[in-house]
């Protein structure tokens, strides 16, 4: 019984530490890179860079959508996208230099402070990002764009 308690306590502490690590990274500072294209407010640039608003929140509300959002940051996007009924050329380079805590932090910044329209936002954890990064390792930018089309119903 004591061993079970210790194992459960260790799991809770590990999950808490990973969540705290993602929250201690400054997602707003990382987002400054994103703002060069998506703008500081996340409104994007018509035809070129999509807004980070309702589409982001809708994706973040679905398990496969959360994987997609991690893949966008870690694998990039290459190909046409339709976001909120408007076409975009769909190119974003992979931000492969970001560790899992940084990816979680920037996604959490967008979901909590920029994309404020749509379903309730649940924070990403470092562990969740690591899981989605691993499951998306074989995707290239074109596959990520197709994943967006599939998840948004534009198949």
Which residue ranges define each predicted feature?
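Positively charged n-region of N-terminal signal peptides that target proteins for export
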Residues: 1-4
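Bacterial N-terminal signal peptides
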Residues: 7-16
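Electrostatic cytochrome c docking/interface patches
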Residues: 15-31, 57-61
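Stable alpha-helical elements in mature extracytoplasmic
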Residues: 23-26, 30, 65, 69, ...
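The canonical Cys-X-X-Cys-His
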Residues: 27, 31-40, 92, 106-109
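Gly/Gly-Pro-rich "capping" loops immediately C-terminal to redox-active cysteine motifs
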Residues: 43-81, 89-99
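Flexible coil segments in periplasmic/lumen-exposed cytochrome c-class electron-transfer proteins
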Residues: 83-84, 95-96, 100-155
